[in-house]
């Protein structure tokens, strides 16, 4: 039996709260069950040096966990003086996912940075961050349009992500921490609205998974992400 008696294809309750903080152009608190991530989108009227004069914009992301987001306190990475490899991997993943739904030329020579801060972690922090960051990004870009800064909408749709895995020989969707800790296979799937994949990160822990199991996990991810798209649409309609 899964935690909270969920079915194998059932995601946790997901809540998206827009305009969560005052100053960011886009601000979202996303909750995947007990996992909570604050996603703030900030706009700068400049681009990184490697894009100077290229007539296009940039979307990037930063990711971090508050010291007491987990069961015991973790030292801030700023205090350590460097980011962990995990942190760098996750923020690059978030940025790639977001760029998949933005026409960078239509964005113009400006940068949107999404800061994803994990307030509380109970599995699936990177997938929650991507799903929430997409809504924050939408709000930031809609503000540029409303302010008359952009004449053409650079948004190409929604992007969302979910974790899937094999736990006790069962394929399951949206893993909580207790499931993730004992999963034989752990996979993160990022998808855009038309069903195309942006990224698939899958790893076997101890026992390899079969081609059939891979397809089963991708099918579960497709079901879960389509539910997330609906949550995003409802949030953006409010």
From Swiss-Prot:
Phosphorolytic 3'-5' exoribonuclease that plays an important role in tRNA 3'-end maturation. Removes nucleotide residues following the 3'-CCA terminus of tRNAs; can also add nucleotides to the ends of RNA molecules by using nucleoside diphosphates as substrates, but this may not be physiologically important. Probably plays a role in initiation of 16S rRNA degradation (leading to ribosome degradation) during starvation. The keyword tRNA-binding applies. PROSITE patterns: RIBONUCLEASE_PH. Keywords: Nucleotidyltransferase, RNA-binding, rRNA processing, Transferase, tRNA processing, tRNA-binding. PANTHER family: EXOSOME COMPLEX COMPONENT, EXOSOME COMPLEX COMPONENT RRP41. Its EC number is 2.7.7.56. The lineage of its organism: Bacteria, Pseudomonadati, Pseudomonadota, Gammaproteobacteria, Pasteurellales. Homohexameric ring arranged as a trimer of dimers. Gene3D superfamilies: GHMP Kinase, N-terminal domain. GO terms for biological process: rRNA catabolic process; rRNA processing; tRNA processing. The keyword Lyase does not apply. It catalyses: tRNA(n+1) + phosphate = tRNA(n) + a ribonucleoside 5'-diphosphate. Phosphate binds at residues 86, 124-126. NCBIfam families: RNasePH. Belongs to the RNase PH family. This is Ribonuclease PH. One of its GO terms (molecular function) is tRNA binding.
